[in-house]
Amino acid sequence: MSVSKLNKMQFSDKMSNLALARVTRKCKEVANASDITEAGIHVEIKENNLMDIKGFIKGPEGTPYAGGTFEIKVDIPEHYPFEPPKAKFVTRIWHPNISSQTGTICLDILKDKWTASLTLRTVLLSLQAMLCSPEPSDPQDAVVAKQFINNYPMFTATAVYWTSYFANSKKDVEPDFNRKVGRLIEMGIRETEAIVYLSCNNWKLEQALQFIFD
């Protein structure tokens, strides 16, 4: 290898390391920012590993998610900020723009609306805002979106139940929901699966049973 080529490689590595250090510093600044903590958002970056960022978002008051804490996994890609972070909900949530099964998020700034001027702060605050303003017309989870549109009270009660069970809120839930979950558990269905089956069938026990055993 020629000296000039080696020098170019070393220069490229140095620039990559500088870019990584700059991005890491900026992400840490977001994690420690007062507006983030005041909004009820906590960020953990383990050992400067931008592939292992955890966000914890408190559910906004006045929503079915109030009282819950939702964990989000964030990965900062190699070409950030020229491509968006990858984010998904680790804590399960009943929301039309978030998959109830995988935590995949439908949010435009995580896709085609991302620009290099946006930041990790923007992502976290936008995710929290999304809990206040679901968009069922552009869903990630079609089942949740259908319930939101056709039976909003049922959607709200279901979202409250999921927030209580998965996100540890202290909100009161529909007693009848607990009874129906108990019935499925007695039949050998695991509790988490029972909640999902009933939620997807508007908490109609017979309909859920037909879905399970057909």
Curated annotation (Swiss-Prot):
Keyword flag Repressor: no
Domain UBA intervals: 172-214
GO CC terms, sorted: nucleus
Entries under SMART domains matching the protein: UBCc
Known pathway: Protein modification; protein ubiquitination
Record EC number: 2.3.2.23
Catalysed conversion reaction: S-ubiquitinyl-[E1 ubiquitin-activating enzyme]-L-cysteine + [E2 ubiquitin-conjugating enzyme]-L-cysteine = [E1 ubiquitin-activating enzyme]-L-cysteine + S-ubiquitinyl-[E2 ubiquitin-conjugating enzyme]-L-cysteine
Keyword terms, alphabetized: ATP-binding, Nucleotide-binding, Transferase, Ubl conjugation pathway
GO biological process terms held by the UniProt record: protein polyubiquitination
Reported consequences of knocking out the gene: RNAi-mediated knockdown results in increased levels of ced-1.
Pfam families documented for this protein: UQ_con (PF00179)
Active site: C106 (glycyl thioester intermediate)
GO MF, any single term: ATP binding
Residue intervals of the UBC core domain: 21-168
Family: Belongs to the ubiquitin-conjugating enzyme family.
Job description of the protein: Acts with E3 ubiquitin-protein ligase trim-21 to catalyze the 'Lys-48'-linked polyubiquitination of ced-1, promoting its proteasomal degradation to maintain appropriate ced-1 levels for apoptotic cell clearance.
Protein name listed in UniProt: Ubiquitin-conjugating enzyme E2 21
